[in-house]
Design a protein with these regions (language model features):
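Conserved catalytic core of nucleotide polymerization and phosphodiester-bond processing enzymes
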Residues: 1-190
């Protein structure tokens, strides 16, 4: 239902979830909810336009990501579902500029502080070489942080204790880690 979709969108969007992941998770049942597939009426209600369809289908990467989503519906139904999911993500990002700005800050700090080691303090957090110092004195650690250029020349970051445990790192993921770690600090104080 719409309430569950909104809840799912807010939870994922806060940490940088993209439309393809959102669309896929809705089809399988986001966070234990029953599967949801958006239809034409819902897409129209969201304000999906013919231009949105043209823009979406005109970008090869969108179509590739859409085709990689496991589905049992038709291609047309999947396209409508993806257009609606993308519209929700776009609306969230437009309306939640402070959140998006924090992802962008954290994304820049992955390179400048966590990788290059330039200390930076943001409110109660200190970003430094491969770690973020929390108000409790504990640290979030990102060992062996490395960056590799993707096909568009953008640096994609990963970290881990060894080659088998490497994980992607990006601004939204850093925000998620910070929120969870600070929440743990608060709970431990209670």
């Amino acid at each position: 239902d719409l309430r569950q979709s909104a809840k799912s969108a807010l939870l994922g969007c806060g940490y940088g979830m993209g439309w393809a992941s959102f669309a896929a998770q809705l089809l399988t049942g986001f966070l234990g909810a029953p599967p949801t597939r958006y239809d034409k009426a819902f897409a129209k209600q969201l304000g999906v336009t013919a231009k949105d369809i043209t823009d979406f289908t005109g970008w090869e990467k969108n179509m590739e990501m859409m085709h990689n989503i496991p589905h049992t519906c038709t291609e047309e139904e999947l396209l409508i579902h993806c257009l609606a999911a993308k519209k929700i993500i776009d609306i969230y990002r437009d309306k939640a500029q402070p959140v998006v700005s924090f992802w962008e800050l954290c994304n820049s700090l992955v390179s400048n502080s966590l990788y290059q080691g330039k200390p930076y303090t943001y409110k109660c957090l200190t970003f430094d070489k491969e770690r973020i110092l929390l108000p409790s004195g504990l640290s979030l650690k990102y060992p062996n942080l490395t960056g590799e250029a993707d096909e568009k020349g953008r640096i994609q970051w990963s970290y881990g204790a060894d080659a088998k445990s490497m994980r992607k790192l990006y601004g939204g993921k850093v925000v998620e880690n910070i929120v969870q770690a600070v929440a743990r600090c608060v709970i431990c104080l209670l």
